[in-house]
Amino acid sequence: MKASTDHHVSGPPPVMIERVTRGGRRLFYRIDVIQQPEKCRACGSGPKSSTDRRPVDPPPVVELRIFEGPRFEEAKDITFTYNANFFLFATLEKARPMAHGRVTGPVVDAPPVLTGMPVSGMAYLDRPIEAGYFLFPDLSVRHEGTYRLSFNLYEETKDDRDKDMEPDEPSSEPQGFFYHRMEIKSADFACFSAKKFPGLGLSTPLSMTMAEQGTRVRIRRDVRMRRRDGKPSSGGGDFSSNSNNNAEDEAARRRRTRTPEPPAREDLRRSLSGTGDAPARNPEPQRRPSAADYRAPPPPNPPPPGFPSAQVPATSHLTFGGAPYGSHSQYQQPTSSSSSSEQVSSVPQSPAYSSHAAQQHYGQAPQPPTPTYPERRLSDHRSSQPNNHPQQSPHQHSYSHRSSPQRERFMPDSRRPSAPSHSHILSARPMTPQSANELRRPSDYNRPIPPPTDVLVADTQATPHLPPIRWPRPNMNLPSPPSEHQEALQPLQPAPLHYESQTHQQQLGGRKRTHDSYEEHSYSYGYSYSHNHSHGYGPTPSARPPAKNRKRPEDVEEKYTVTETMVVDRPEQFFPKPLKYVWTQCRAEPPPRE
């Protein structure tokens, strides 16, 4: 084996050896350190040495090339075609060895100073030239000082003809092991303490070229310098300018204001009964109607004896005192789609009024109020019966209207009125199907409101007769009223209108007697609707004058007073006040007979 050296400028010269195989091939091995280590930081030998350590910078790179030929000048490069395995082992040694003093005992070996990965396999790369390369990106030194690296090349042959020539004397060494081929040393480099370490520099172009071809090399594109307060930085002007820029960026980040959070979305719908400024908007989408909702309504149950047969929809979800909302359908009250979300008072609703909100589309826009004339009230009362209801498809209404037996419940603090107090409005006249279907056309809600004079004339010309309200009759033998009359609602006006029924004026002829029945209707559309009935019943006046002591039974007057008060407020576009239902009934006991 013959070794030769070539001149190298940046470090020690490359090393080349020559050998002859068993098959007669002459091979030349040339190894060179193409990237020399320059500096590193001492990592120490404590428990934190493995976690906080800096590798040798830049990482050492060793190049290997293999040639075949009779002479090196005529040799051919066979690095990629030669069938063998190579690896390089690195060791650390001091650049200036120190002589041992005179000691009597044996020399104690120092602990290892090199740490990291000292072994590297050969990588076949095309750049910078086609050759085999050994990289050491993870080498660290424990103590500060000046050192150099020593690289030893080992080879494992694959073919028997590529093995070394057999020696003249047989050896007892086992077959099939690695052969040590050559050794090369790196240039000297310094290891600094943590306080004096200048920092890691940028990655070299050779390291970037290696990383681009898939090797595991750490790439640093910024300078990592240690900045000391009050001292000029050793990194130059670029590091100082970068530090100033970083300080300015940090100050700008601190001056920035925090991005305001978006306002919270109002997921909950505001109730229209608690506020007067609630906007009219469509309700949230409800559930899809089930198959049971599309079924035709069942036939109505037969009413109890002595009561009129009146059916009302039972699908409304608003209840008053346990009774379904709109269970007593006699007077019609137009509502909008927003009424489905209104809060309901705990006071039970008056039996003389009901809402047809269940007959409107659930997502329909609010409609303007419509005055409820006697003809409309009568039609609405009859339209609640299932026989007069037209068959409606599921596309017209979100929920079907199913009939159920009507229940009547009373609050414990209310008094049930007697039958004669309401009997003057219980008679009903025949109604044609055309009047019941008129209320289901949207154009009916947009009709112009007639003047009050037309209403009075209509009231005097045709007085409707309504069916009796289903109230249990008390055990009081009171005479029936002399006449039956029906009040009429007036259109909305800024100022309240007060008048008395002209029918009574015609009957009385301008005279008012205390024992005749009379009605007082006071209407206030600005904020509420008040309906008062006062009836005074007494015996029919006879031709003979009453006794002086007034002891005769027919001279004793029996008076019965029923007062009904209802306050109805609509949404903002109709009335400014919130929704309230007030139902008051009072009954005065007749005076005791002497």
Swiss-Prot record:
Broad class of where this protein is predominantly found: nucleus
Q: Which residues form the Velvet domain?
A: 24-220
**What Gene3D superfamilies does the record tag this protein with?**
Velvet domain
**Places the protein is found:** Nucleus; Cytoplasm
Question: For bias kind Pro residues, which ranges apply?
Answer: 296-307
Listed Low complexity bias regions: 327-351, 384-403, 523-538
Q: Which family does it belong to?
A: Belongs to the velvet family. VeA subfamily.
What protein name is recorded for this chain?
Answer: Developmental and secondary metabolism regulator veA
Species name: Pyricularia oryzae (strain 70-15 / ATCC MYA-4617 / FGSC 8958) (Rice blast fungus)
Per the UniProt record, the lineage of the source organism begins with: Eukaryota, Fungi, Dikarya, Ascomycota, Pezizomycotina
